[in-house]
């Protein structure tokens, strides 16, 4: 079948993806081969494909396709994450549009809506990944709320609780008033923001004295339960044992003493609000202070807010300052830069809040995971992230794992009374009943007497088990799949979830398998625009990946994404990269169209130039293959692509095909053609991980193949010894060919016209390639001479001098005039450069690079003058 003139990406991509799916090439089963396993970082079930997903999944597909070609049993497990906060927010918003308030629904009713939403939107991003060419084992697709996955999470919670690692505590937590849930410390993003520092005067009870405190949050004075001073601060010695009065609410509070107060900072007086600040809570515990919580879960003030009850905290801030000013309590207001914690999910300003929550003790669990990275059992790529990882793991805090949400795994704690300890933890209510009866010595307890904790577990508490749970390794720890596929090989993910997810997976791996979950962690950079801004919907600077693939084809976009994506460094994305990728795909297509159009002659002998060209390219291929293997080994995927790109574009298309291409109207020798096809097939194998669609299309067009011979399951090229000398000699020969082409172009000598070439040979490096030089330069006669040739144009390549007789080809007088003018200009340029180099102040004062550049200019000018003089001598 004749090839289309233009590569039709859409048609070809659909054809081959369907073919791969129909023939089950992506599916893996346990067998005798060595496994190569990747688990996908599960995108949010609510998500659609963005540029970060494109980069991350292209990298994974490159690794998995290469492993498949290398003969490994390649298994790439896809799936999605239930994303508690994000999904619940979307469902609540949808219900609001429909006029339904979540508060009026039971948990079961709300979950029906959540599952409906999930079934409707959950598959979108995975379908989009298929357009990219992702060769996931779709039969293994997992969702973190699948029954098996959820059961694994519950089992782990119960196990860790019984080991004493999970506890329930009344602690200061990060509260997101928009999502109405707690967040872990890692889910809080701190940003420098400009605010105000308000100086407020508190009256001292029973006197005319006042104390001045400074606060950035004047609305919280309604929760103040003490003023703290340093016992060594002589300014306030007279206030020991006294009390102060909180403005507006007129609460009488003690003036306490504690060395925690820095006498040099602010006014030396500290307002203590134990319900709304972690440090204040510690002071409150130490001094037995009352706790007054002024906020509702949605960030509005409660009854302790007095006449501000029901108003948002930020509205109250403005109004309370106005009231305090009218009372004469505000002594001054200063602008102030300070760090403000915001929710990683909703962007809302976080409130420190005291709450009964569930926590996982991390210090002891984290140690094996820290050792694994420091001892290189788990490799972070690039290594610059090791110190960041170590710092976090050495300072790890207990993980708040409960969330005030309904969407997610419900915490398996069952309460049988009103006391804080009146609960049991069990995998199901039947088991919980037995435990509750034992704990209370009350066999009359019934399941109806038990109430399950309404909170859900943090989403990360399910995804930290991902490499184990996708193979059912929690529920069936000795099943054949977990024993075969675990530990996985490579994880490709973003540095921003190094702690949210990667570190915790390593912790879970050692806790539940006594083994690392993966060997290598490839940390991608952030995709940014040309102005170095992170791509985001809100900025409107992120192109739609589906639109990009429609325009440039999936292969083109894959190449574009990878051309500038070194591990751990940010990718400065420019759509021109996709254009370049598409151009590369078209180059491959046109190269094959050229080959496919050749007529083969079975009886024609292979020419010397063909033999040389094939020997050179095979060596060049093997040398590049070694470089590519090295890049893959070091996870320099963009470098592996660039080496492949240069080999195919420059060496194969621009040089090799020109060297073996039969002259116009002639046929190609059968032996040459077969060897060209053989090296083309090797090219397609190393191209396949990067451009799977076009490589499979060409592979299948070369000859009829059955399903076992598809490119996707072919064999990666074997490393072979290569001839460094022939590569070096070609580099020299290519200089000679370029010199001939330059003279033809400059002197308007048509390529159709044959020319003679004489070589004053001081270096024999080009002799092996004489046949190639003659073919590509259209040389009628190539001679080796011992003296310079008169009446000829000349150029140099290393120590060889080349002469092209020009009798009748050019106007000699015009050429002499032109060369004389060029010589004069070059001599003038040389004089100015040498003037600089004779100036001691310049040589001693300028940077080394600048001086070196001038010396290079001098050397280049001297060489050019010598060539021009030789050309003039030859013409006179």
Specify the residue positions occupied by each region the protein language model found:
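Non-catalytic terminal extensions that flank enzyme cores
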Residues: 1-51, 74, 331, 344, ...
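Metal-dependent nuclease catalytic cores in nucleic-acid-processing enzymes
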Residues: 58-75, 278-283, 287-288, 321-324, ...
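Acidic, turn-prone loop/beta-hairpin segments
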Residues: 81, 173, 177, 184-189, ...
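C-terminal low-complexity, glycine/proline- and small-hydrophobic-enriched intrinsically disordered tails
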Residues: 579, 701-876
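Residue patterns forming the tRNA-binding/recognition surfaces of aminoacyl-tRNA synthetases
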Residues: 15, 22-23, 92-210, 221, ...
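Alpha-helical recognition segments enriched in aromatics with Gly/Pro capping
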Residues: 259-261, 287-299, 405-408, 413-416, ...
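Protease-associated
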Residues: 208-272, 278-282
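N-terminal catalytic cores of NTP/NDP-binding nucleotidyl/phosphoryl-transfer enzymes
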Residues: 29-91, 144, 153, 213-215, ...
